[in-house]
From Swiss-Prot:
GO terms for biological process: callus formation; cell wall organization; positive regulation of secondary cell wall biogenesis; regulation of DNA-templated transcription; xylem vessel member cell differentiation. It is found in: Nucleus. It comes from the Eukaryota. This is NAC domain-containing protein 37. Residues 9-158 form the NAC domain.
Length: 365
Protein backbone atom coordinates (compact mmCIF):
# COMPACT_ATOMS: atom_id res chain seq x y z
CA UNK A 1 0.00 0.00 0.00
CA UNK A 2 1.57 3.24 -1.12
CA UNK A 3 1.63 6.27 1.17
CA UNK A 4 -0.71 9.14 0.48
CA UNK A 5 0.67 11.79 -1.83
CA UNK A 6 1.94 14.73 0.21
CA UNK A 7 0.54 17.18 -2.35
CA UNK A 8 -3.04 16.16 -1.55
CA UNK A 9 -3.27 18.92 1.06
CA UNK A 10 -1.93 22.48 0.91
CA UNK A 11 1.19 23.49 2.87
CA UNK A 12 0.49 24.39 6.48
CA UNK A 13 -2.46 22.04 6.69
CA UNK A 14 -2.78 20.26 10.04
CA UNK A 15 -5.34 17.58 10.72
CA UNK A 16 -6.46 17.52 14.34
CA UNK A 17 -10.12 16.46 14.66
CA UNK A 18 -11.96 16.02 17.95
CA UNK A 19 -13.52 12.77 19.11
CA UNK A 20 -16.96 14.04 18.12
CA UNK A 21 -15.75 14.95 14.62
CA UNK A 22 -14.01 11.62 14.11
CA UNK A 23 -17.11 9.63 15.04
CA UNK A 24 -19.95 11.92 13.99
CA UNK A 25 -18.55 12.95 10.61
CA UNK A 26 -15.72 10.74 9.32
CA UNK A 27 -16.71 7.34 10.71
CA UNK A 28 -20.42 7.84 10.08
CA UNK A 29 -19.79 8.78 6.44
CA UNK A 30 -17.35 5.87 6.03
CA UNK A 31 -19.89 3.31 7.26
CA UNK A 32 -22.63 4.88 5.11
CA UNK A 33 -20.27 4.90 2.09
CA UNK A 34 -20.76 8.63 1.67
CA UNK A 35 -18.21 10.99 0.17
CA UNK A 36 -15.94 12.78 2.63
CA UNK A 37 -15.12 16.36 1.63
CA UNK A 38 -11.37 16.02 2.18
CA UNK A 39 -10.27 12.42 2.08
CA UNK A 40 -7.22 12.51 4.33
CA UNK A 41 -7.85 9.33 6.37
CA UNK A 42 -6.47 6.18 4.74
CA UNK A 43 -7.78 2.62 4.97
CA UNK A 44 -5.22 0.50 6.82
CA UNK A 45 -5.19 -3.19 7.67
CA UNK A 46 -4.00 -2.56 11.21
CA UNK A 47 -3.23 -6.21 11.89
CA UNK A 48 -0.85 -6.52 8.96
CA UNK A 49 1.18 -3.43 9.68
CA UNK A 50 3.37 -2.47 12.62
CA UNK A 51 2.71 0.79 14.48
CA UNK A 52 6.05 2.34 13.54
CA UNK A 53 5.14 1.92 9.87
CA UNK A 54 2.04 4.07 10.33
CA UNK A 55 4.14 7.25 10.24
CA UNK A 56 4.86 6.77 6.55
CA UNK A 57 1.59 5.13 5.54
CA UNK A 58 -0.65 7.75 7.18
CA UNK A 59 1.42 10.84 6.53
CA UNK A 60 -0.57 13.98 5.62
CA UNK A 61 1.23 16.73 3.73
CA UNK A 62 4.73 17.96 4.50
CA UNK A 63 4.24 18.97 8.12
CA UNK A 64 5.69 16.91 10.95
CA UNK A 65 3.03 14.80 12.64
CA UNK A 66 2.58 13.48 16.16
CA UNK A 67 -0.68 11.64 15.48
CA UNK A 68 -1.72 9.33 12.69
CA UNK A 69 -5.33 8.64 11.64
CA UNK A 70 -6.71 5.71 9.64
CA UNK A 71 -9.76 3.55 9.06
CA UNK A 72 -9.52 -0.14 9.90
CA UNK A 73 -11.93 -3.04 9.56
CA UNK A 74 -12.12 -5.25 12.63
CA UNK A 75 -12.13 -9.01 12.14
CA UNK A 76 -12.84 -11.81 14.57
CA UNK A 77 -9.93 -13.70 16.03
CA UNK A 78 -11.70 -17.01 15.36
CA UNK A 79 -14.49 -17.58 12.80
CA UNK A 80 -16.87 -18.90 15.46
CA UNK A 81 -15.65 -16.71 18.33
CA UNK A 82 -16.44 -13.21 19.56
CA UNK A 83 -12.94 -11.82 20.23
CA UNK A 84 -11.30 -9.38 17.84
CA UNK A 85 -8.00 -10.25 16.23
CA UNK A 86 -5.45 -7.65 17.36
CA UNK A 87 -2.19 -9.44 16.58
CA UNK A 88 0.51 -8.32 14.14
CA UNK A 89 3.73 -9.95 13.03
CA UNK A 90 5.81 -8.23 15.73
CA UNK A 91 3.34 -8.06 18.58
CA UNK A 92 -0.25 -7.36 19.54
CA UNK A 93 -2.58 -4.58 20.67
CA UNK A 94 -3.98 -4.97 24.16
CA UNK A 95 -7.02 -3.08 25.45
CA UNK A 96 -6.58 -1.16 28.70
CA UNK A 97 -9.05 0.59 30.97
CA UNK A 98 -12.72 1.06 30.22
CA UNK A 99 -14.30 2.41 27.08
CA UNK A 100 -15.15 6.10 27.08
CA UNK A 101 -18.40 7.45 25.68
CA UNK A 102 -18.32 10.04 22.89
CA UNK A 103 -21.18 12.55 22.88
CA UNK A 104 -22.46 15.01 20.32
CA UNK A 105 -23.75 17.61 22.78
CA UNK A 106 -25.96 15.32 24.90
CA UNK A 107 -26.46 12.47 22.44
CA UNK A 108 -24.31 9.34 22.59
CA UNK A 109 -22.77 8.72 19.18
CA UNK A 110 -19.89 6.34 19.84
CA UNK A 111 -17.36 4.74 22.17
CA UNK A 112 -13.58 5.06 22.42
CA UNK A 113 -11.37 2.11 23.34
CA UNK A 114 -7.74 2.56 24.36
CA UNK A 115 -5.11 0.01 23.36
CA UNK A 116 -1.37 -0.39 24.02
CA UNK A 117 1.01 -2.19 21.68
CA UNK A 118 3.12 -5.04 23.12
CA UNK A 119 6.08 -6.52 21.31
CA UNK A 120 6.26 -10.30 21.29
CA UNK A 121 3.56 -12.79 22.09
CA UNK A 122 1.14 -12.88 25.00
CA UNK A 123 1.49 -13.28 27.88
CA UNK A 124 5.18 -12.37 27.75
CA UNK A 125 4.93 -9.31 25.55
CA UNK A 126 6.95 -6.17 26.28
CA UNK A 127 4.97 -2.95 26.46
CA UNK A 128 5.95 -0.28 23.94
CA UNK A 129 5.33 3.48 23.73
CA UNK A 130 2.63 3.14 21.08
CA UNK A 131 -0.95 3.99 22.07
CA UNK A 132 -4.09 3.79 19.95
CA UNK A 133 -7.62 5.12 20.34
CA UNK A 134 -10.18 3.04 18.51
CA UNK A 135 -13.57 4.70 17.84
CA UNK A 136 -16.76 2.87 16.95
CA UNK A 137 -20.35 3.96 16.40
CA UNK A 138 -22.57 3.26 19.38
CA UNK A 139 -26.01 4.37 20.49
CA UNK A 140 -26.19 2.43 23.76
CA UNK A 141 -23.39 2.81 26.29
CA UNK A 142 -24.23 -0.52 27.98
CA UNK A 143 -24.51 -2.50 24.75
CA UNK A 144 -21.89 -5.22 24.04
CA UNK A 145 -19.04 -3.89 21.86
CA UNK A 146 -19.02 -4.61 18.16
CA UNK A 147 -16.33 -7.09 17.21
CA UNK A 148 -16.68 -6.51 13.47
CA UNK A 149 -17.05 -3.53 11.21
CA UNK A 150 -15.31 -0.26 10.45
CA UNK A 151 -13.57 1.78 13.10
CA UNK A 152 -11.52 4.96 12.94
CA UNK A 153 -8.25 5.03 14.85
CA UNK A 154 -5.81 7.59 16.20
CA UNK A 155 -2.28 6.30 16.89
CA UNK A 156 0.44 8.19 18.76
CA UNK A 157 3.48 7.59 20.93
CA UNK A 158 3.46 7.76 24.70
CA UNK A 159 4.84 10.92 26.26
CA UNK A 160 8.26 10.25 27.77
CA UNK A 161 8.47 10.20 31.58
CA UNK A 162 9.77 13.47 33.02
CA UNK A 163 9.23 15.38 29.80
CA UNK A 164 8.21 18.99 30.27
CA UNK A 165 4.46 19.48 30.05
CA UNK A 166 4.66 22.00 27.26
CA UNK A 167 2.25 22.02 24.33
CA UNK A 168 5.19 22.37 21.95
CA UNK A 169 7.00 19.29 23.36
CA UNK A 170 4.02 16.97 23.69
CA UNK A 171 4.35 14.07 21.31
CA UNK A 172 0.57 14.05 20.99
CA UNK A 173 -2.48 15.94 22.11
CA UNK A 174 -3.29 12.78 24.06
CA UNK A 175 -0.83 11.15 26.43
CA UNK A 176 -0.60 7.93 28.34
CA UNK A 177 -0.27 7.25 32.05
CA UNK A 178 0.30 3.93 33.78
CA UNK A 179 -2.73 1.74 34.34
CA UNK A 180 -4.41 2.52 37.66
CA UNK A 181 -5.24 -0.34 40.08
CA UNK A 182 -8.96 0.41 39.84
CA UNK A 183 -8.91 -0.10 36.09
CA UNK A 184 -9.66 3.51 35.13
CA UNK A 185 -8.71 4.47 31.60
CA UNK A 186 -4.99 5.26 31.61
CA UNK A 187 -4.98 7.40 28.47
CA UNK A 188 -6.38 10.84 29.13
CA UNK A 189 -7.32 13.90 27.17
CA UNK A 190 -5.00 16.85 28.05
CA UNK A 191 -7.99 18.97 29.16
CA UNK A 192 -9.17 16.21 31.50
CA UNK A 193 -5.64 15.76 32.84
CA UNK A 194 -5.16 19.48 33.50
CA UNK A 195 -8.52 19.80 35.28
CA UNK A 196 -7.66 16.73 37.35
CA UNK A 197 -4.25 18.07 38.37
CA UNK A 198 -5.33 21.68 38.94
CA UNK A 199 -6.05 21.26 42.64
CA UNK A 200 -2.69 19.51 43.15
CA UNK A 201 -0.82 22.36 41.48
CA UNK A 202 -2.42 25.02 43.69
CA UNK A 203 -2.34 22.81 46.82
CA UNK A 204 1.45 22.81 46.63
CA UNK A 205 1.51 26.59 46.78
CA UNK A 206 3.22 27.12 43.43
CA UNK A 207 3.22 30.76 42.44
CA UNK A 208 4.19 32.70 39.39
CA UNK A 209 7.04 35.20 39.36
CA UNK A 210 4.78 38.23 39.74
CA UNK A 211 3.10 36.73 42.82
CA UNK A 212 6.47 35.93 44.41
CA UNK A 213 7.77 39.43 43.68
CA UNK A 214 4.61 40.89 45.20
CA UNK A 215 5.16 38.88 48.36
CA UNK A 216 8.80 40.03 48.59
CA UNK A 217 7.77 43.67 48.13
CA UNK A 218 5.16 43.29 50.85
CA UNK A 219 7.70 41.81 53.25
CA UNK A 220 10.20 44.58 52.51
CA UNK A 221 7.50 47.20 53.09
CA UNK A 222 6.63 45.70 56.46
CA UNK A 223 10.29 45.51 57.48
CA UNK A 224 10.95 49.12 56.49
CA UNK A 225 7.91 50.41 58.36
CA UNK A 226 8.34 48.89 61.81
CA UNK A 227 7.73 52.28 63.42
CA UNK A 228 4.58 54.05 62.34
CA UNK A 229 3.73 57.60 63.30
CA UNK A 230 0.38 58.05 65.03
CA UNK A 231 -1.80 61.17 64.83
CA UNK A 232 -1.69 63.70 67.65
CA UNK A 233 -3.86 62.89 70.65
CA UNK A 234 -5.55 65.62 72.63
CA UNK A 235 -5.25 65.51 76.41
CA UNK A 236 -6.73 68.05 78.88
CA UNK A 237 -3.57 67.92 81.00
CA UNK A 238 -1.01 68.18 78.16
CA UNK A 239 -0.52 70.89 75.52
CA UNK A 240 -0.73 69.92 71.84
CA UNK A 241 2.61 68.85 70.39
CA UNK A 242 3.85 69.84 66.97
CA UNK A 243 4.07 67.25 64.24
CA UNK A 244 7.69 66.30 63.55
CA UNK A 245 9.16 67.83 60.41
CA UNK A 246 12.04 65.39 60.12
CA UNK A 247 12.36 61.61 59.83
CA UNK A 248 12.86 61.29 63.58
CA UNK A 249 9.70 59.15 63.99
CA UNK A 250 10.42 56.70 61.16
CA UNK A 251 13.13 54.13 61.68
CA UNK A 252 14.20 51.33 59.38
CA UNK A 253 14.96 47.90 60.75
CA UNK A 254 17.96 47.54 58.44
CA UNK A 255 19.50 50.98 59.10
CA UNK A 256 20.02 52.31 62.63
CA UNK A 257 19.54 56.08 62.78
CA UNK A 258 20.89 57.74 65.95
CA UNK A 259 19.30 61.11 66.70
CA UNK A 260 21.59 63.33 68.81
CA UNK A 261 19.64 65.55 71.22
CA UNK A 262 21.02 68.85 72.55
CA UNK A 263 22.67 68.85 75.96
CA UNK A 264 19.66 70.35 77.80
CA UNK A 265 17.34 67.80 76.22
CA UNK A 266 19.70 64.98 77.18
CA UNK A 267 19.75 66.02 80.82
CA UNK A 268 15.97 66.35 80.91
CA UNK A 269 15.56 62.96 79.29
CA UNK A 270 17.96 61.33 81.76
CA UNK A 271 16.10 62.88 84.69
CA UNK A 272 12.88 61.50 83.24
CA UNK A 273 14.40 58.00 83.05
CA UNK A 274 15.64 58.26 86.63
CA UNK A 275 12.16 59.28 87.75
CA UNK A 276 10.69 56.26 85.97
CA UNK A 277 13.17 53.97 87.73
CA UNK A 278 12.20 55.43 91.11
CA UNK A 279 8.52 54.89 90.41
CA UNK A 280 9.14 51.27 89.40
CA UNK A 281 11.05 50.66 92.62
CA UNK A 282 8.22 52.20 94.67
CA UNK A 283 5.71 49.91 92.98
CA UNK A 284 7.90 46.89 93.66
CA UNK A 285 8.16 47.86 97.35
CA UNK A 286 4.39 48.36 97.52
CA UNK A 287 3.73 44.98 95.92
CA UNK A 288 6.23 43.34 98.28
CA UNK A 289 4.48 44.98 101.22
CA UNK A 290 1.11 43.81 100.00
CA UNK A 291 2.36 40.23 99.71
CA UNK A 292 3.75 40.43 103.24
CA UNK A 293 0.42 41.71 104.52
CA UNK A 294 -1.30 38.84 102.74
CA UNK A 295 1.03 36.33 104.38
CA UNK A 296 0.36 37.86 107.77
CA UNK A 297 -3.38 37.78 107.12
CA UNK A 298 -3.37 34.08 106.14
CA UNK A 299 -1.22 33.15 109.14
CA UNK A 300 -3.43 35.06 111.54
CA UNK A 301 -6.54 33.38 110.11
CA UNK A 302 -5.05 29.94 110.63
CA UNK A 303 -3.92 30.76 114.17
CA UNK A 304 -7.28 32.24 115.14
CA UNK A 305 -9.21 29.21 113.86
CA UNK A 306 -7.09 26.84 115.90
CA UNK A 307 -7.04 28.85 119.16
CA UNK A 308 -10.11 31.04 119.47
CA UNK A 309 -12.60 29.74 116.88
CA UNK A 310 -14.77 31.81 114.61
CA UNK A 311 -15.10 34.80 116.98
CA UNK A 312 -11.43 35.73 116.83
CA UNK A 313 -11.51 35.30 113.04
CA UNK A 314 -14.05 38.14 112.82
CA UNK A 315 -11.79 40.41 114.85
CA UNK A 316 -8.80 39.76 112.64
CA UNK A 317 -10.95 40.34 109.58
CA UNK A 318 -11.93 43.82 110.81
CA UNK A 319 -8.32 44.73 111.62
CA UNK A 320 -7.11 43.60 108.23
CA UNK A 321 -9.87 45.50 106.46
CA UNK A 322 -8.62 48.66 108.19
CA UNK A 323 -5.10 47.88 107.04
CA UNK A 324 -6.27 47.31 103.49
CA UNK A 325 -8.18 50.60 103.52
CA UNK A 326 -5.04 52.36 104.71
CA UNK A 327 -3.04 50.69 101.93
CA UNK A 328 -5.57 51.82 99.29
CA UNK A 329 -5.40 55.39 100.56
CA UNK A 330 -1.60 55.26 100.52
CA UNK A 331 -1.58 53.89 96.95
CA UNK A 332 -3.98 56.61 95.79
CA UNK A 333 -1.87 59.37 97.30
CA UNK A 334 1.30 57.95 95.75
CA UNK A 335 -0.40 57.68 92.35
CA UNK A 336 -1.56 61.31 92.50
CA UNK A 337 1.92 62.49 93.49
CA UNK A 338 3.45 60.52 90.60
CA UNK A 339 0.92 62.03 88.17
CA UNK A 340 1.74 65.54 89.37
CA UNK A 341 5.45 64.80 89.01
CA UNK A 342 4.96 63.61 85.42
CA UNK A 343 2.90 66.66 84.49
CA UNK A 344 5.52 68.94 85.99
CA UNK A 345 8.32 67.18 84.11
CA UNK A 346 6.49 67.41 80.76
CA UNK A 347 5.74 71.10 81.30
CA UNK A 348 9.41 71.81 82.10
CA UNK A 349 10.56 69.78 79.13
CA UNK A 350 8.25 71.61 76.73
CA UNK A 351 9.18 75.02 78.12
CA UNK A 352 12.90 74.35 77.60
CA UNK A 353 12.45 72.77 74.13
CA UNK A 354 9.91 74.99 72.41
CA UNK A 355 12.07 75.23 69.30
CA UNK A 356 12.06 71.51 68.64
CA UNK A 357 9.42 69.22 67.16
CA UNK A 358 8.46 66.09 68.96
CA UNK A 359 6.89 62.98 67.33
CA UNK A 360 5.05 60.11 68.87
CA UNK A 361 6.26 56.66 67.80
CA UNK A 362 4.95 53.18 68.35
CA UNK A 363 7.64 50.53 68.72
CA UNK A 364 6.53 47.03 67.77
CA UNK A 365 8.51 44.28 69.41
Amino acid sequence: MEPMESCSVPPGFRFHPTDEELVGYYLRKKIASQKIDLDVIRDIDLYRIEPWDLQEQCRIGYEEQNEWYFFSHKDKKYPTGTRTNRATMAGFWKATGRDKAVYDKTKLIGMRKTLVFYKGRAPNGKKSDWIMHEYRLESDENAPPQEEGWVVCRAFKKRATGQAKNTETWSSSYFYDEVAPNGVNSVMDPIDYISKQQHNIFGKGLMCKQELEGMVDGINYIQSNQFIQLPQLQSPSLPLMKRPSSSMSITSMDNNYNYKLPLADEESFESFIRGEDRRKKKKQVMMTGNWRELDKFVASQLMSQEDNGTSSFAGHHIVNEDKNNNDVEMDSSMFLSEREEENRFVSEFLSTNSDYDIGICVFDN
